[in-house]
């Protein structure tokens, strides 16, 4: 679809709102609302990352031998890549773990071999969106590679170069030897990087929910990891009020239940979806108040009888801290928390937490709208794509392949970054760190299984971000329910109305 004048004006409008946000003239929530009205929503993980922007870290230091190119790959960078020495490739992305790790690695390894300079600007997601909408509206070449939240993939499909078409050109010297596109975890391609069968970018990151439990507590009580939702609740009840060796009290469940915060919406989806509910049904219908959703809400409130004090003030950061402090025994949440639990100066529970397969949902709804996919493994992720407006496309394509290649994915996994390539999950350095240690990868098997079999995706329509994000009506109403200020029926009725209004704004 060629960009029309209405689309162009919408993009320029979003770019202008981004500048207002950066100048402090509007709030982030207002930016999300205005961007949504222009047709640019943000995914679940995008909202999470937006509110947990990482501070700059010291450059990554890899152990000897972790980053290993094949001889053909190294020769290709030194010969084909070197043709573009002196070229600068520009990319703007969020400041996430993979962006930090790979940008550091580019300075250390890619630039010396090729002579290509990588200008990687790391910003909040709202500013990334502002840049991309400005660039595409004006067909500017100011960024050569786009970082795309999964909710934007369909909107920018015509502004990118199809990477599969480039990879399928077997005669091109610009294609990286041994790149092996089929090594990407296949479930990630349609979820993060494709639109209506057309590849838009290449998978880059994948936050996802996993089941984490206190093995020391389970062992003491003779428990096994839950395989069903009923068993999970039984384990929550059985572990609640457990007395640890130091005399501290362990509660049954740790939530991310901060009233009005997007984290609460994330937590809620696990119980909604696992009970056969969903936000949407066929043809844009909103089903959030049906009997399945009611069952999910009641299950959530039952968990709420077994949580530490203060849970309704915790976002995902508070939840992660509570895990590290040993305040609970069961969690279904973001796998990104897990490596920090094995760091002695951050955690009182080093080695105590384990992962297990997510408990099976009672049932799953299969007929939904707006790309919603109910499943307990709440996911979110992004891809990176080649701009069709870039004036240095060949150099940018060389870098894009290197940045998403198996050797780089394996090196990034050294810092506990969740891989998007199958080979990285079984690489020797990854398996070596599957033990209790800083930078552990012992949670990776649970992550891979969640990606391949249990991924759940929130709806993707423009108004979703403003409705479900922090300060929006959905987490605000959920907060009333989890604090006892409002009953389930009223809460779900109000959420239904909010979602219907958000859809109507398209």
Residue ranges and their predicted role:
Residues 235-240, 282-313, 357-361:
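Glycine-centered hinge/linker elements that transmit conformational signals in sensory
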Residues 105-187, 216-227, 322, 329-330, ...:
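Extracytoplasmic "Venus flytrap"/periplasmic binding protein-like
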Residues 64, 85-96, 116-121, 144-145, ...:
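Short, well-ordered beta-strand elements
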Residues 191-204, 209, 233-286, 292, ...:
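Extracytoplasmic/periplasmic solute-binding protein
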Residues 30-56:
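N-terminal export signals
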Residues 439-498:
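C-terminal capping/gating helix-and-loop segments adjacent to ligand/active sites or protein-protein/ligand interfaces
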Residues 60-83, 150-209, 249, 264, ...:
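Hinge/lid segment of periplasmic solute-binding proteins
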Residues 1-30, 52-54:
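N-terminal secretory signal peptides
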């Amino acid at each position: 679809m060629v960009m029309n004048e209405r689309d162009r004006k919408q993009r320029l409008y979003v770019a202008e709102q981004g500048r207002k946000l950066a100048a402090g003239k509007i709030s982030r929530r207002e930016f999300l609302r205005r961007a949504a009205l222009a047709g640019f929503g943000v995914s679940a993980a995008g909202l999470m990352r937006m509110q947990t922007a990482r501070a700059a870290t010291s450059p990554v230091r890899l152990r000897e031998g972790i980053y290993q190119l094949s001889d053909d790959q190294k020769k290709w960078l030194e010969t084909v890549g070197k043709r573009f020495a002196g070229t600068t490739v520009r990319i703007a992305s969020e400041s996430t773990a993979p962006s930090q790790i790979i940008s550091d690695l580019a300075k250390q390894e890619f630039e010396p071999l090729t002579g290509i300079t990588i200008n990687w600007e790391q910003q909040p997601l709202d500013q990334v969106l502002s840049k991309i909408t400005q660039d595409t509206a004006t067909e500017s070449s100011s960024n050569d590679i786009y970082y795309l939240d999964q909710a934007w993939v369909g909107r920018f499909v015509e502004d990118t170069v199809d990477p599969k078409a480039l990879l399928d050109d077997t005669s091109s010297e610009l294609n990286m030897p041994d790149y092996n596109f089929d090594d990407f975890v296949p479930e990630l391609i349609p979820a993060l990087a494709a639109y209506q069968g057309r590849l838009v970018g290449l998978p880059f990151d994948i936050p996802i929910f996993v089941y984490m439990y206190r093995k020391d507590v389970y062992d003491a009580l003779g428990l096994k990891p839950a395989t069903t939702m009923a068993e999970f609740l039984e384990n929550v009840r059985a572990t609640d009020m457990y007395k640890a060796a130091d005399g501290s009290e362990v509660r049954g469940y740790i939530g991310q239940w901060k009233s009005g915060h997007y984290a609460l919406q994330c937590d809620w989806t696990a119980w909604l979806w696992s009970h056969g509910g969903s936000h949407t049904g066929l043809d844009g219908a909103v089903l959030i108040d049906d009997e399945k959703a009611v069952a999910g809400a009641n299950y959530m409130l039952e968990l709420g009888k077994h949580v530490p004090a203060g849970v309704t003030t915790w976002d995902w950061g508070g939840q992660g801290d509570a895990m590290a402090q040993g305040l609970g025994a069961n969690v279904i949440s973001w796998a990104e928390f897990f490596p920090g639990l094995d760091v002695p100066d951050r955690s009182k529970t080093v080695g105590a937490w384990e992962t297990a397969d997510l408990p099976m949902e009672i049932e799953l709804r299969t007929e939904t709208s707006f790309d919603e996919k109910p499943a307990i493994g709440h996911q979110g992720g992004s891809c990176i794509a080649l701009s069709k407006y870039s004036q240095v496309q060949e150099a940018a394509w060389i870098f894009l392949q290197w940045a998403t290649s198996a050797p780089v994915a394996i090196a990034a996994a050294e810092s506990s970054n969740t891989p998007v390539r199958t080979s990285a999950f079984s690489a020797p350095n990854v398996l070596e760190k599957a033990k209790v240690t800083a930078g552990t990868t012992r949670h990776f098997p649970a992550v891979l299984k969640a990606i391949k079999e249990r991924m759940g995706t929130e709806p993707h329509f423009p108004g979703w971000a403003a409705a479900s994000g922090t300060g929006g009506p959905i987490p605000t109403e959920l907060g009333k329910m989890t604090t006892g200020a409002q009953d389930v029926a009223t809460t779900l009725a109000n959420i239904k109305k909010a979602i219907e209004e958000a859809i109507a704004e398209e």
